[in-house]
Swiss-Prot record:
GO cellular component, one term: ribonucleoprotein complex
Protein name according to UniProt: Large ribosomal subunit protein bL27
GO terms classed as biological process: translation
Family, per entry: Belongs to the bacterial ribosomal protein bL27 family.
Keyword RNA-binding included in the entry's annotation: no
Chain segments carrying region Disordered: 1-21
Keyword vocabulary terms for this entry: Ribonucleoprotein, Ribosomal protein
Species of provenance: Pelagibacter ubique (strain HTCC1062)
Length: 84
């Protein structure tokens, strides 16, 4: 009798949900204190004036104003908030 053992189940077939990272408020947009401007892993974008950085590297506004992105030294991108 020809027999065959049961085939193993696939080890693939799962995927984690996206983490919803990235820029949340773009240049020129008006923000209020506490608004998250960028969600990121590590410092892809650095904090400039009138913004804070959380322990997960999220950048948020500390004043009301407009978002400004700027290139700094050694190709670093900074985000600031220009008060109204």
């Amino acid at each position: 009798m020809a027999t065959k053992k049961a085939g193993g189940s696939s080890r693939n077939g799962r995927d984690s949900a996206g983490r919803r990272l990235g820029v949340k408020k773009y240049g020129g947009e008006v923000v209020i204190p506490g608004n998250i401007i960028v969600r990121q892993r590590g410092t892809k974008i650095f904090p400039g004036e009138n913004v804070g950085m959380g322990k997960d590297h999220s950048i948020f506004s500390v004043v009301e104003g407009k978002v400004v992105f700027k290139k700094g030294k050694s190709d670093r991108t900074f985000v600031s908030v220009k008060p109204n």
